[in-house]
Amino acid sequence: MQYINIVNEGVKQLHPYQAGKPIEELERELGITNIIKLASNENPFGLPDSAKQAILAELDNLTRYPDSNGFYFKQTVAKKFGLSPEQITLGNGSNDLLELVAHTFANEQDEILFSQYAFIVYPLVTQAINAKKVEIPAKNYGADLDGFLQAISDKTKLIYLANPNNPTGTFLSAGEISQFLNQVPAHVIVVLDEAYTEFTLPEERVDSFTLLKKHSNLVICRTLSKAYGLAGLRIGYAVSSAEIADLFNRVRQPFNCNSLALAAATAVLHDDAFIAKVAENNRQGLKLLEDFFTAKGLNYIPSKGNFVMLDVNQPALPIYQALLQKGVIVRPIAGYGLPNHLRISIGLPEENQRFLLALNEVLGL
């Protein structure tokens, strides 16, 4: 029996996600030590103490199922951002929520719109449910909002829009997003993916939650994997109208967030000092890399995230491999249609310096 012949039609075109090898295995294979990973946009500071303490306090409760509704976590999010708990949906990371939106609203052959050079999960989710992918050509490596508006049809059900965008780091202002939402028909759900919003400068940051008061078709997805340092625990949340959140909770798996994730996330949302430290390290590190690229005449896309996309002006895979031999892992992004580019996550100061030294040697600058 060839089981591929009986699966959902969309699944036939998919391939399993290819994760990188563990650092320990790479060190063994390459015969080197002290590899640094600047590939996955993770928090270089590791787990904050506030989260560690919350996890330790929760250990004795692990024989019980987690709180399926995330009562204390939702209360914390609601208080922090001036929301109602009924507007919040729990996710096993924001990827879970991006998929949940599609399963809730889209049917086969509905159209789902997303930008060229946008997060690879958007087309994967669309393909998996056998909906129709509509990729909008990018404008200066970012979302062309006019292009989105022109592409909307009666069959359009969802729009995925990242701000800042991964992997390019481009950014849409509050005015641009507001004007765009004013022109999107009510039957189209707009998913605003804000996985990297904490890295934007406070004076530039979009207060997206206020947009919900006017736009009931808006869903905002956030994660605690990036700035908050909880990538291994898998927790995120969506904010929407209470009506849409109720629909999500009809589809969402119960207990999709484990007890340790809920405890750690609740604690770190109170940890403003940690987030301030993370944001300042990112600001300085991003400036260091971008100043270096400018001084060396290298092309890059100015970023508002915790990463920067570099054009090495040649196939990037050999550059990636040469950097790996020097103990520095970055991300080649040919899978996004950018074969000459690398995405580099911002690390600790000493990691950023080590990357620049390795890049200087590899490129012969």
From Swiss-Prot:
Positions in coiled-coil regions: none
GO MF term (any one): pyridoxal phosphate binding
Modification N6-(pyridoxal phosphate)lysine occurs at: 226
EC numbers for this chain: 2.6.1.9
GO biological process: L-histidine biosynthetic process
UniProt keywords, alphabetically: Amino-acid biosynthesis, Aminotransferase, Histidine biosynthesis, Pyridoxal phosphate, Transferase
Catalysis: reaction(s): L-histidinol phosphate + 2-oxoglutarate = 3-(imidazol-4-yl)-2-oxopropyl phosphate + L-glutamate
Keyword Nucleotidyltransferase attached: no
Enzyme class: transferase
SUPFAM superfamilies: PLP-dependent transferases
InterPro entries the UniProt entry points to: Aminotrans_II_pyridoxalP_BS, Aminotransferase_I/II_large, HisP_aminotrans, HistidinolP_aminotransfase, PyrdxlP-dep_Trfase, PyrdxlP-dep_Trfase_major, PyrdxlP-dep_Trfase_small
Required cofactor names: pyridoxal 5'-phosphate
Pathway assigned in UniProt: Amino-acid biosynthesis; L-histidine biosynthesis; L-histidine from 5-phospho-alpha-D-ribose 1-diphosphate: step 7/9
Complex and partners: Homodimer.
Family: Belongs to the class-II pyridoxal-phosphate-dependent aminotransferase family. Histidinol-phosphate aminotransferase subfamily.
PANTHER family xref list: HISTIDINOL-PHOSPHATE AMINOTRANSFERASE, HISTIDINOL-PHOSPHATE AMINOTRANSFERASE 2
Stated name of the protein: Histidinol-phosphate aminotransferase 2
Organism: Pasteurella multocida (strain Pm70)
